[in-house]
Design a protein with these regions (language model features):
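Bacterial N-terminal signal peptides that target proteins for export
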Residues: 1-10
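N-terminal leader/targeting pre-sequences
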Residues: 14-181
Length: 181
């Protein structure tokens, strides 16, 4: 009887261990975004959807107005509070594994990390969903947000003009979150 209980317990533990990575993969990846002072400005959850990734964001303490959101090439969000205009340069440029030009309206684009603008309300909050069909959560794919150690989700001070190369005149980087496995 005791051996039977041990066997059932061991089988349950193995089944649970095998199921956990799949549950995490199906649930997506949640990223905390912080400003240059290290204060949280909210979260974004990346979920595999169709041929791309759906990003659900819940943001706070941001300047009202239209802002750009991009995926950047490095999984780094090093900020310098003394030089906010240069914050998060460690994240590199836009994620662009296919070597295209910037902008959703650019015939030679877009970068894999280019996405539509979003609006922050007068109260400093924004909640919404954006789809990026050019990236994936699948490890090993060249357009995976986890490639080369990961990427970063970036919020800029201004809206992206959707065509200027290399970054859409979106202004300083004001919030950043690291995307890693």
């Amino acid at each position: 009887m005791r051996d039977r209980i041990l066997l059932v317990g061991t089988m349950a533990a193995v089944a649970l261990t095998l199921a956990l990575p799949q549950a995490q993969a199906k649930g997506g990846k949640t990223v905390e975004l912080k400003d240059a002072k290290g204060q949280s400005v909210g979260t974004a959850t990346l979920i595999a959807k169709g041929k791309g990734v759906e990003i659900k964001y819940h943001l706070k303490n941001l300047p009202p107005g239209e802002h750009a959101m991009h995926i950047h090439q490095n999984a780094k969000c090093e900020a310098d509070p003394a030089a906010p205009a240069d914050a998060f340069k460690s994240a590199g440029g836009h994620f662009n594994p296919e070597g295209k030009q910037h902008g959703l309206e650019n015939p030679q684009g877009p970068h894999a990390g280019d996405m539509p603008n979003f609006t922050v309300g007068a109260d400093g909050t924004a909640k919404g969903t954006v789809q990026d069909p050019r990236v994936t959560l699948a490890e090993g794919a060249p357009n995976s947000v986890f490639a080369n150690g990961g990427t970063a989700l970036m919020i800029h001070a201004k809206a992206d003009d959707m065509k200027s190369d290399p970054a859409g005149n979106a202004g300083p980087r004001i919030a950043c979150g690291v995307i890693t496995k």
